[in-house]
Design a protein with these regions (language model features):
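Ferredoxin-like alpha/beta domains used as RNA- or RNAP-binding modules
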Residues: 1-145, 172-318
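Contiguous, well-ordered alpha-helical segments that form the cores/surfaces of helical PPI scaffolds
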Residues: 139-144, 156, 160-162
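Short strand-turn-strand beta-turns centered on an Asx-Gly dipeptide
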Residues: 165-167
Length: 318
């Protein structure tokens, strides 16, 4: 771990980790404590904080979980989206000549039923999509695939050359993957697949003396079950220790694919978004674009654009 104070209970900041202290910190942040105003995140009339303090606290707790190992300046410049998608229903206005045809075809009734269903379900929680670019990072995807007990361990696996990206050894943990990319982790480098050193290190304390010696050991850390889930945008194969980044995370009514310990469209995420909208870089120069972290999707788009330009030049010369 790069910093011993990451899991301090006095700070109570949830991280991307399976550590037991991290689960307790998550409990302290998600359960409202009336006696501890420093840990409880309250808004509105019952809050003792100003609007600036509410936004600052929201930004702090949100960034502690979503990419705390990313420099704040780099996060605001390259990982923060320019805007969030608009999910408000678009009302259609038709002329008098089309109204009679729609009533005849019963399209208006179907549209009304869809609008009522949309109002019942509510709008999609898009607030958590502000961290969609962070979810594309290779180290974060390794943690989401449950191949590493923390995002810091996942970063160590990449830096030490234990990860293959599309069949080639990859050392850059900052790489953002494109849909269709496949990454694999070396099983011998995964700590959960190593022999148990001490009796109290794992929940897997049942001995099987009759088991063949060639079976791979599996030692699950204590209190890891709340973090064992796979997002919908990943296709994971535990038999081969590999996964495919299928598509970008999205959201639909009452569901967001970006995992977060806070409400996907709650006040914490909203206040954090308001903070970044007021404190973000205004533009990117050519020199700044050259310093951008590795993005495979942007690289593929540039290669496609160059291929189209070369094709146009080749056809124009014929």
């Amino acid at each position: 771990m790069r910093d011993g104070g990451l899991m301090k209970i006095s700070r109570a900041l949830p991280r991307m980790s399976w550590h037991p202290k991290n689960l307790y910190n998550l409990f302290l942040r998600t359960v409202d404590s009336k006696n501890d105003h420093r840990r409880a995140i309250t808004f509105g009339d019952n809050s003792i904080r100003s609007l600036f303090q509410e936004r600052w606290v929201s930004k702090t707790v949100v960034r502690a979980y979503h990419g705390d190992h990313i420099n704040e300046k780099i996060f605001k410049q390259w990982y923060l989206p320019d805007y969030l998608p608009d999910v408000r229903p678009r009302r259609k206005v038709f002329g008098d000549d089309k109204a009679s045809l729609q009533e005849f075809a019963k399209r208006r009734q179907r549209e009304k039923a869809l609008e009522e269903e949309e109002q019942t379900k509510g709008l999609a929680p898009i607030g958590s999509l502000m961290f969609a670019e962070v979810e594309r990072r290779l180290d974060v995807l390794i943690f989401r695939s449950c191949f590493a007990p923390s995002v810091y361990e996942a970063r160590r696996l990449v830096v030490h050359g234990n990860v293959l990206l599309n069949g080639k050894r990859h050392y850059n943990a900052n790489t953002r993957l494109a849909p269709g990319d496949m990454f694999s982790v070396k099983p011998s480098a995964m700590r959960i697949l190593q022999p148990q050193r001490e009796k109290g290190e794992s929940d897997n304390v049942i001995d099987h003396p009759d088991a063949p010696p060639e079976l791979t050991p599996f030692n699950l850390p204590f209190y890891a079950s709340p973090w064992l889930f796979i997002p919908a945008y990943l296709e994971v194969s535990f038999a081969t220790c590999s996964a495919i980044y299928v598509r970008h995370p999205t959201a639909r009514p009452q569901y967001s694919e970006v995992p977060t310990p806070y409400g996907a469209d709650g006040e914490v995420i909203r206040h954090a978004w308001e903070w970044y909208m007021q404190n973000r870089p205004r533009k990117r120069t050519e020199s700044q674009w050259s310093k951008m972290p590795d993005d495979r999707l942007r690289r593929q788009m540039e290669e496609l654009r160059l291929g189209r330009n070369s094709l146009k030049l080749a056809t124009s010369g014929i």
